[in-house]
């Protein structure tokens, strides 16, 4: 079973950036970071993967949160997702997004809209 946690906003704290997700039916306890990010070109989002014993859960980080994420990446700020009042560190998010940005730059395979959005924020 695949599920998605949708980030709606960001909250800045000293030395931390919190991606605030909508309340979810997903049981967050027992999930662990997979240190892997995918791209959702259709929804202009990065998908951070969490997992448990039986499934993957995607944390969808929309383009509306990218500027705050980019700033956090530049300042080596730790990034978390908060779901149902539980915070989880998104380990390796910076490195994964940096890798994706390199691959997305000028690459029409991701779709013009995504390429433009990524280049505008990250380059």
Swiss-Prot record:
* Pfam annotation, one family: UPF0738
InterPro entries, sorted: UPF0738
Q: Which family does it belong to?
A: Belongs to the UPF0738 family.
Protein name in the entry: UPF0738 protein BALH_1059
- Native organism is Bacillus thuringiensis (strain Al Hakam)
